[in-house]
Regions:
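Adenosine-cofactor binding site in Rossmann-like domains, unifying the SAM/SAH pocket
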Residues: 16-54, 125, 130-132
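A conserved beta-strand element that flanks and buttresses the S-adenosyl-L-methionine
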Residues: 64
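Class I S-adenosyl-L-methionine
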Residues: 3, 42, 50-57, 69-240
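Class I SAM-dependent methyltransferase "Motif I" SAM/SAH-binding loop
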Residues: 2-8
Length: 241
């Protein structure tokens, strides 16, 4: 199962292996494609969350979650003061929603879970992350002929880019070993100097605040997804999930 998951990329390796997969996100309409059942769900609504827990309790082998990072990511720190003035509890509320993902997994009887968020306030408001990686560090799990299936103009083949990503996980989750590839060399969009851009290419090459831009910038690294499956699928079999 995957929460706050628009692309479904975190589930694709599992679906391809024959697992029953469910993706919940407010952007979805109810549909089934590529072996994944997508459901519209407002995961900020407690009644919706409880319905999901009751539906899947005792049947879930692994839960991945990608809660909204708009109010938590360090990249948006310059706006925090203004947001706090308008709504003093905005950040604590966002952190609580992220932490709730772990509670959902545990309530379903699944201790193999992980919550993903970029570097930011969640490390202070919840706890330090259990694992940190750049997408390029798992690019070796993808084919040498890889091309991103959804956003090829923006996301390099084999996830060959840097974007510091934090993982909080449960005791049943196995952190996969890294298989790094060399990150792409690009021109920094702001300083016009050569070298490895300090921004992910999809951040440097996109502008505006559209939902599509947000989806591209937050797309699950596919190398990480493949690595998670490879490291964890045997344990889901042993648990009988």
């Amino acid at each position: 199962m995957s929460l706050f998951d628009y692309t479904g990329e975190a589930l694709k390796p599992w679906a391809e292996a024959g697992y029953e997969c469910f993706a919940y996100d407010i952007q979805h309409t109810r549909t089934h494609r590529d072996g994944i059942s997508f459901f519209h769900a407002d995961l900020h609504d407690s009644a919706t969350v409880w319905t999901i827990v009751e539906r899947h309790a005792g049947k879930v082998g692994l839960v991945s979650a990608f809660p909204v990072c708009t109010d938590l990511a360090a990249s948006g720190a310059c706006w925090w003061a203004g947001k706090r003035e308008a709504d003093p509890g905005f950040q604590e509320r966002a952190a609580r929603r992220a932490m709730q993902c772990a509670e959902i997994a545990e309530a379903m009887g699944c201790d193999a879970w992980y919550v993903e968020n970029p570097v930011g306030a969640l490390s202070r408001l919840w706890r330090k992350p259990d694992h940190v990686f750049d997408p390029c560090e798992y690019g070796g799990y993808l084919s040498v002929t890889d091309e991103h299936p959804l956003y090829p103009p923006h996301i390099p083949p084999r996830d060959a880019y840097r974007k510091k990503t934090c993982i909080w996980h449960g005791p049943g989750f196995i952190v996969p070993p890294k298989r790094p590839v060399e990150p792409v060399q690009v021109v920094c969009a702001r300083k016009r100097t050569g070298g490895t851009c300090r921004y992910a290419p999809q951040a440097a090459g996109l502008g505006g605040k559209s939902q599509r831009t947000k989806n591209i910038r937050s797309a699950t690294p596919r190398g990480w997804a493949a690595a998670v499956f490879e490291a964890n699928f045997i344990y889901t079999l042993l648990r009988g999930r």
